[in-house]
Amino acid sequence: MKYQLQKTDGRARLGKLIFERGLVDTPAFMPVGTYGSVKSMTPDEITETGAQIILGNTFHLWLRPGQDVIKLHGDLHDFMQWQGPILTDSGGFQVFSLNSMRKIEEKGVSFRHPLNGSEIFLSPEKSMEIQLDLGSDIVMVFDECPPYPSDLIYMKSSMEMSLRWANRSREHFNNLNNKNALFGIIQGGLSLELRETSLQGLLQIGFDGYAIGGLAVGEPKEEMYRVLDFLCPRIPDNKPRYLMGVGKPENLVEGVRRGIDMFDCVMPTRNARNGHLFVTHGVIKIRNTRYKTDISPLDPDCDCYTCRHYSRAYLHHLDRCNEILGARLNSIHNVRYYQRLMADLRHAIYEERLECFVEEFYKKIGLSIS
């Protein structure tokens, strides 16, 4: 993978990620394919939304169907028939969300299989091996994801262990002769001092890109933006910057303003399944009775398949009847909304009018600029 920085507007960056499997324009949003699928959508439909890269979940794919089954097909691209680049997380976030079901040690994490109760073990080395078998174009280091809030003593200890795990991840990644990209993950909670220590430690190890983890876990948005304001100028300009798990449209806009290149979140598809649809002027809750007789398109400004063919009344009907087609059409729209937003942000950076775009964006959705 190579990163090309093409233009800046303030701190916002326009660029490209170059893979053997294709190009990714940045800033980019990655739809999440937890179990080897972006829920309810085919690869062709994902491509039609404008998405160029997706995210796969190492932890869940390791448990089901298992890396051996995926290897029978070749790799994850062949298994799910997505031929573009794939980023896989390390499994750390999912393991640490198990709480009482897991035990953290220096060597790794032991936990109970959430499906059958058997004891299994995940380490930095094992995570690198799984992601190699998945054929991940971008591999993430194994790290600890401390809960919010956490006291400073625990946060410091966790960050230091994540640095040691990052070093082990890098060493085993190299030993496996993996030719794809490996990203480090900056931890440290809301402490700028710990964030600085984490970043400097990762820079000494050396990675192809740098992710910011441990945000969007319940902290006020102002705190998240404070951490981004601190970190982004300190990450080398020639490396991509990835803000993990952040997905509200306004958070994407603020991340781009601060110099973030990559985002992922389940929000577009999860909200779609719950009838919460992102449109130019905010959010439509399609199951509300007011849409029962509304024959207008979901979003007149949107060019997705759903908006070109169906009315709000029809989508309301599908949602009320729990029809699977409703979830599919809603997902197509929400993912396209996110891709349109990223394309608009890229175009605004190219034309050096990002702040004008941001002001217009907030006026349309009825929020103030952060």
From Swiss-Prot:
<keyword id="KW-0479">Metal-binding</keyword>
<dbReference type="GO" id="GO:0008616">
    <property type="term" value="P:queuosine biosynthetic process"/>
</dbReference>
<dbReference type="InterPro" id="IPR004803">
    <property type="entry name" value="TGT"/>
</dbReference>
<feature type="binding site">
    <location>
        <position position="304"/>
    </location>
    <ligand>
        <name>Zn(2+)</name>
    </ligand>
</feature>
<comment type="function">
    <text>Catalyzes the base-exchange of a guanine (G) residue with the queuine precursor 7-aminomethyl-7-deazaguanine (PreQ1) at position 34 (anticodon wobble position) in tRNAs with GU(N) anticodons (tRNA-Asp, -Asn, -His and -Tyr). Catalysis occurs through a double-displacement mechanism. The nucleophile active site attacks the C1' of nucleotide 34 to detach the guanine base from the RNA, forming a covalent enzyme-RNA intermediate. The proton acceptor active site deprotonates the incoming PreQ1, allowing a nucleophilic attack on the C1' of the ribose to form the product.</text>
</comment>
<dbReference type="InterPro" id="IPR050076">
    <property type="entry name" value="ArchSynthase1/Queuine_TRR"/>
</dbReference>
<dbReference type="GO" id="GO:0046872">
    <property type="term" value="F:metal ion binding"/>
</dbReference>
<keyword id="KW-0808">Transferase</keyword>
<feature type="binding site">
    <location>
        <position position="187"/>
    </location>
    <ligand>
        <name>substrate</name>
    </ligand>
</feature>
<comment type="pathway">
    <text>tRNA modification; tRNA-queuosine biosynthesis.</text>
</comment>
<feature type="binding site">
    <location>
        <position position="333"/>
    </location>
    <ligand>
        <name>Zn(2+)</name>
    </ligand>
</feature>
<keyword id="KW-0328">Glycosyltransferase</keyword>
<keyword id="KW-0862">Zinc</keyword>
<feature type="region of interest" description="RNA binding">
    <location>
        <begin position="245"/>
        <end position="251"/>
    </location>
</feature>
<dbReference type="InterPro" id="IPR036511">
    <property type="entry name" value="TGT-like_sf"/>
</dbReference>
<dbReference type="Pfam" id="PF01702">
    <property type="entry name" value="TGT"/>
</dbReference>
<dbReference type="GO" id="GO:0002099">
    <property type="term" value="P:tRNA wobble guanine modification"/>
</dbReference>
<feature type="binding site">
    <location>
        <position position="302"/>
    </location>
    <ligand>
        <name>Zn(2+)</name>
    </ligand>
</feature>
<feature type="region of interest" description="RNA binding; important for wobble base 34 recognition">
    <location>
        <begin position="269"/>
        <end position="273"/>
    </location>
</feature>
<dbReference type="InterPro" id="IPR002616">
    <property type="entry name" value="tRNA_ribo_trans-like"/>
</dbReference>
<feature type="binding site">
    <location>
        <position position="307"/>
    </location>
    <ligand>
        <name>Zn(2+)</name>
    </ligand>
</feature>
<dbReference type="GO" id="GO:0101030">
    <property type="term" value="P:tRNA-guanine transglycosylation"/>
</dbReference>
<feature type="binding site">
    <location>
        <position position="143"/>
    </location>
    <ligand>
        <name>substrate</name>
    </ligand>
</feature>
<dbReference type="GO" id="GO:0005829">
    <property type="term" value="C:cytosol"/>
</dbReference>
<comment type="similarity">
    <text>Belongs to the queuine tRNA-ribosyltransferase family.</text>
</comment>
<dbReference type="GO" id="GO:0008479">
    <property type="term" value="F:tRNA-guanosine(34) queuine transglycosylase activity"/>
</dbReference>
<feature type="active site" description="Proton acceptor">
    <location>
        <position position="89"/>
    </location>
</feature>
<feature type="active site" description="Nucleophile">
    <location>
        <position position="264"/>
    </location>
</feature>
<protein>
    <recommendedName>
        <fullName>Queuine tRNA-ribosyltransferase</fullName>
        <ecNumber>2.4.2.29</ecNumber>
    </recommendedName>
</protein>
<feature type="binding site">
    <location>
        <begin position="89"/>
        <end position="93"/>
    </location>
    <ligand>
        <name>substrate</name>
    </ligand>
</feature>
<keyword id="KW-0819">tRNA processing</keyword>
<comment type="subunit">
    <text>Homodimer. Within each dimer, one monomer is responsible for RNA recognition and catalysis, while the other monomer binds to the replacement base PreQ1.</text>
</comment>
<feature type="binding site">
    <location>
        <position position="214"/>
    </location>
    <ligand>
        <name>substrate</name>
    </ligand>
</feature>
<keyword id="KW-0671">Queuosine biosynthesis</keyword>
